[in-house]
A protein has these predicted regions:
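Bacterial Sec-dependent N-terminal signal peptides
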Residues: 1-27, 44
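Flexible, low-complexity junctional segments that flank or bridge functional domains
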Residues: 20-312, 316-346, 438, 443-450, ...
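Conserved acidic, small-residue-rich alpha-beta core segments centered on
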Residues: 148, 324-491
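Generic N-terminal initiation segments characterized by hydrophobic and/or small/turn-forming residues
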Residues: 1-5, 11-13, 34, 264, ...
Length: 513
C-alpha cells in the first residue's frame, strides 16, 4: 500500500537516483567475515528499533529483544549471503508485518534472475495438513500429476514442513492463510526448502494414488540445464515464432510495444459481461499506478449501468495491493455510506542516525515532513486521512449484488477495499481469508534499507494504520462470508472453485432461495 498522490513523485525520484550494480566481481559463494556480518546486523536492528512503528504491535518488546539477541548470537563464523539472509528472515518474521521483509542484494538478485539453478521439481498447493501437486517441472513424470496429494517429502509430513518453513515467512499478524499461499506461489517452497533442509539429488515422495492408497516414489531434482524437452519447446514455442512442420522454427514479427501493453493491461484488469444472466466479472490484479485504473473503473461502471447488470463478481484473489487512492476509487463505486481510510495513521519519527542506510532517505523524510504533523502523543500523524470522509459516487454507482473473491494473495490496499465493504447488505465475500490484516497494517511509505557490508536489503514501512478501532485486533485477515476452499479434485481438474461458488450464489439469489 502506497502513499496516494505522492507515490508518483517517489517513483520518479527513485528512478533519477537509481544506479546499476556491477556484476564483474560477483561470486554467489562469497563468504563474509563475522565482523562484517555483525556490523550489518547492528544496523539491521538499529534501523528497525528506530523507525518501525509496529515493531511491538504483535510481539512484545521483551520477545523481540530475545529474537534480536538470538539472531546476533548465531553469527559465529563466516557466512554466504543466503545464510545471513536466512538469519535475518527469521528475526524479521517475528515482527508479524507483511510489508517488512528481507531481500537479497541487487547483485545476488541479478544472479538468481539469470542463473539456471536446480529446483525442487514439484510446485505444490498448500493448506492445513495438505500438499497437492499443482505442477511438475519434470514433464515426463506420469505419476505425480496435477492434483496428486503428497503425504511426505523425504519423510517429512505437510505439517512438519510448514512448521519448519513458516517461522521464516512474513505475514500480517497471526495470519496463516498468507503463509500457505506464499509457499504455493512460484518457487518459494523450493527456495526455502533448499535454504533450511538442503537439496538432495533425489527425493523420496509419499503420495496418494487415485484409489487413495499411500504409495512411495523417488523423483530426481529438476535441473533446467539438462531439460532437453523444455529446451526444444522453448525454441519452437518461444514468443514471436511459429512451427511449420519439421525443421527449425520460423520467426515472425514480435508484437510491438503497444500490443504488449494492451495485453498486459488485459491480464491485469478486465471486465466481462454475461448479458444472459445480467452478470459481470471484473478481474483486478493490482492497485498500482501505470494501468489507467481510474479510466478503467469509470468505463467499467458506465458499462454496468448501460447494460443493466444486476450481479458483479470482483476477483481480487491475486491483488497484492498498491495505491490506496485507487482502491478508494473502486470502493466509492460500491459502498453505500461515507467512510474513512484511517482512525489513526502515523510515523514515529522523521530522522534518525540511520538515515544514510535508507535508500533515498532524505526524500522520504521530506515527504513525511509534508504529509504529517507532530501531535501531543509524539507521533507524526497523517491528519488528512484521519479526518477525511469519502462519499459514494453518484454517477454509475452500482447497487446490485456484489461478490468479492478473496484469498491469501489479497493484501494491503486490497484489504482496505474488501474491509470497507464487508458487512454491507448487498456484498458477499467469497473464498478464503485475505493475506492482509483486517484491523490495520504498516505501510504507505516503504523505502528499502541497504546494509553496508553485504548489501542485503529489507523493506521498511514508515506508517502504522489502524482502519477502525472498533474492529477486533486479532491478527487475522478478512474472513469470507462464504468460504470456498481448495480440494485435490479441483486442482487436478483445473477448476475455478471460487468463481463457481459465486455463480452458485447468484443462481440461488436469482431464484429467491
Amino acid at each position: 500500500m502506497k502513499l496516494p498522490a505522492l507515490s508518483l513523485v517517489v517513483t520518479w525520484c527513485l528512478f533519477l537516483t537509481a544506479c546499476s550494480t556491477s556484476q564483474k566481481d560477483f561470486r554467489p559463494d562469497r563468504k563474509y567475515a563475522p565482523e562484517q556480518l555483525k556490523k550489518d546486523y547492528r544496523v539491521f536492528r538499529g534501523v528497525l528499533e528506530a523507525w518501525h512503528p509496529s515493531l511491538y504491535w504483535y510481539t512484545s518488546r521483551d520477545s523481540m529483544n530475545y529474537y534480536f539477541d538470538r539472531g546476533y548470537s548465531q553469527i559465529t563464523d563466516s557466512m554466504t549471503e543466503p545464510q545471513f539472509r536466512t538469519i535475518l528472515s527469521y528475526v524479521i518474521a517475528q515482527v508479524d508485518c507483511g510489508h517488512t521483509s528481507i531481500r537479497y542484494s541487487k547483485a545476488y538478485s541479478h544472479y538468481l534472475d539469470t542463473a539456471r539453478l536446480r529446483q525442487f521439481p514439484l510446485i505444490l498447493k498448500f493448506w492445513p495438513d495438505t500438499m497437492v501437486v499443482a505442477a511438475n517441472l519434470n514433464r515426463r513424470d506420469s505419476v505425480l500429476r496435477r492434483g496428486t496429494p503428497i503425504a511426505s517429502i523425504n519423510g517429512r509430513s505437510p505439517r512438519q514442513l510448514t512448521d519448519t518453513l513458516f517461522p521464516y515467512i512474513v505475514t500480517d499478524g497471526y495470519n496463516l492463510t498468507g503463509k500457505y499461499q506464499y509457499l504455493s506461489t512460484g518457487l518459494h517452497f523450493s527456495s526455502w526448502y533448499k535454504e533450511l533442509l538442503g537439496y538432495t539429488d533425489t527425493f523420496e515422495i509419499g503420495y496418494l494414488d487415485t484409489a487413495g492408497v499411500l504409495r512411495q516414489t523417488r523423483i530426481p531434482i529438476y535441473d533446467p540445464r539438462g531439460d532437453t524437452v523444455r529446451r526444444s519447446l522453448g525454441r519452437s514455442l518461444q514468443p514471436g515464432t511459429v512451427q511449420r512442420g519439421p525443421g527449425p522454427a520460423q520467426r515472425m514479427r514480435s508484437p510491438g510495444r503497444r500490443a504488449r501493453k494492451r495485453r498486459e493491461l488485459l491480464l491485469t484488469r478486465n471486465l466481462q459481461v454475461d448479458s444472459a444472466s445480467h452478470t459481470a466479472f471484473l478481474t483486478l490484479n493490482t492497485f498500482e499506478h501505470g494501468y489507467h485504473l481510474r479510466a478503467f473503473f469509470r468505463h467499467s461502471f458506465g458499462v454496468l449501468a448501460e447494460q443493466h447488470v444486476r450481479n458483479l463478481v470482483i476477483d481480487v484473489r491475486s491483488n497484492g495491493g498498491g495505491d490506496a487512492s485507487l482502491s478508494t476509487v473502486l470502493t466509492r463505486y460500491l459502498i453505500d455510506k461515507k467512510f474513512k481510510l484511517a482512525d489513526s495513521l502515523y510515523a514515529v519519527r522523521r530522522h534518525s542516525r540511520y538515515d544514510r542506510y535508507i535508500n533515498n532517505g532524505f526524500l522520504y523524510s521530506f515527504l513525511t515532513f509534508i504529509a504529517s504533523s507532530r501531535r501531543p502523543d509524539g507521533k507524526y500523524h497523517f491528519g488528512y486521512f484521519e479526518r477525511h470522509y469519502f462519499r459514494p459516487y453518484r454517477n454509475d454507482h452500482f447497487d446490485g449484488q456484489v461478490y468479492i473473491l478473496t484469498g491469501g494473495n489479497s493484501f494491503s490496499a486490497t484489504c482496505l477495499f474488501a474491509g470497507a465493504l464487508k458487512g454491507q447488505s448487498n456484498v458477499t465475500l467469497v473464498g478464503e481469508e485475505t493475506g492482509g490484516a483486517y484491523y490495520g497494517n504498516t505501510a504507505w511509505m516503504i523505502p528499502d534499507v541497504t546494509l553496508p557490508e553485504t548489501k542485503v536489503r529489507f523493506r521498511l514501512p514508515r506508517f502504522r494504520l489502524v482502519v477502525d478501532r472498533q474492529r477486533e485486533k486479532n491478527g487475522l485477515g478478512i474472513q469470507p462470508d462464504v468460504p470456498a476452499l481448495p480440494s485435490a479434485e479441483a486442482i487436478g481438474k483445473g477448476l475455478d472453485f471460487k468463481t463457481a461458488r459465486a455463480k452458485e450464489l447468484i443462481r440461488l439469489h436469482s431464484s429467491g432461495q
